[in-house]
Amino acid sequence: MDFLDQVLADRELRTALAGGLDAEPTPTARILANAIADAFGPGALAVIHYGSHAQRSDARADSAHDFFVIVERYHDAYLSLTSAIDTSVGPRTAEVLAHVLPPNIHAIRAPDGRDGRSKCAVLTLRGLRLAARMETADHFTQGRLFQNVQLLWARDDQSREDVSSALVEMRIRTYQWGQPFLPQSFDAETYCRVLLETSFSAEVRPEGDDRVTQLLDAQRVALLPVYSALLDGLTRHGILERGKDGYRQVVFPPLAERRRRQRYFRISKARGTVRWAKHIALYDGWLDYVVQKIARRSGVAVELTERERRWPFIFLWPKAILFLRTRPQQRRMRK
């Protein structure tokens, strides 16, 4: 029996944990979400807004908006997408790649390209539910969707309910993957910080030491009430107890569980690194996107020669290896 079964069945708690999903987005995010839904056609079930624009965490006006597009079936979704916009691969190739290290990532612009651009992760409802239940091989989806996100568009009431339910379960199960890294006693802010730090450790990222603090500060108003409600719910169900510092674990996880979770996150990082090859094949303008993100997040300006732009798979390796060895995240790990 899942030790979180009673928590997952707590209707009052689930209502509290849906907080923020219906928050009002920016006009640009709304326009992009509607354009994305149109592009994926009748097989689109929902569009979830996540990332720096959703969190209001230092996003620039010209940076891409991040979305998860939840679809019924990859086949139908990609037939619609490839007929609506120009893509780097055909529908059959995209469908095949969707089953290899999901999700696929695509760049999609609003009509006429006037209202920004979006970076879309495409996942079936089944795939979202597997991620919510911690039944995926890596942390890509969970690491993004446990944060402040908005459900901007849904095909119908049932689709909205299905996707909201999966997002709420994802929030509940943060305790499942975060518990081994928590101190014996903690408060809601420490809980959120540990979740962010643990998720960041599972990916190769360009950010410096202060990125987790920036994210926590930007999402504080949205995240702390949600995860305070979760911790209160875990206390009601006997998984936590009240302590002088907020909450206290009733049963501290054994060392074997911590090692198992550490192994999961190491595998997740390896899968995330390999997944970049798929992003390159699918994401139009991937090279400029990566260079801009490195500059924005790490402060490192990467100047590319014409030869590196034309044949990146041949000539870009020395700069890529140098950055991976000297990025702020790597320097922090060596301390």
Describe these PLM feature segments.
Residues 1-39, 43, 48, 54-62, ...:
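Catalytic core of pol beta-like nucleotidyltransferases
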Residues 70:
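Short hydrophobic/aromatic beta-strand micro-patches
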